[in-house]
Design a protein with these regions (language model features):
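Active-site-proximal alpha-helical scaffold in enzymes
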Residues: 91-104
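Conserved "HGTGT" condensation-loop signature of ketosynthase/thiolase-family condensing enzymes
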Residues: 1-84
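Short pre-catalytic strand/loop immediately N-terminal to key active-site residues, enriched for Gly-Thr
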Residues: 83-93
Length: 104
């Protein structure tokens, strides 16, 4: 049996859009719009434009049926390298924690 040592993972930081009440400020924004804005803010903060990351993990509390492959579409909407793989997770109230556990 072949032993693979644990992979080193770095969670470099995070960004989010500001909180607001439901059905107010973000009513006309899509999940993709909001997630892409948060991801691009992270890319800008850490000067990652053009870089291919090992994985991008994004979370949404609720997704619409049109949000298929949401994280991948968001990566393509940023200045990250298009080859960067991505996945998203939906978990009400625990999305960020669950995503960090999966990545780490």
């Amino acid at each position: 049996m072949h032993y693979n040592p644990p992979r080193r993972v770095a969670i470099i930081g995070g960004r989010r859009i500001p909180f607001c009440r439901a059905n107010t400020s973000y009513t006309h924004q899509s999940n993709q719009d909001m997630m892409t804005a948060a991801l691009q803010a992270l890319v800008d903060a850490y000067r990652l434009g053009g870089e291919r990351l090992g994985d991008v993990a994004l979370g949404a509390v609720m997704k619409h049926s049109r949000d298929w492959n949401l994280a991948r579409e968001c990566v393509l909407g940023t200045t990250l390298a298009a080859e960067t793989p991505a996945f998203d997770l939906q978990r009400a109230c625990g999305t960020s924690l669950e995503t960090a556990i999966i990545v780490g």
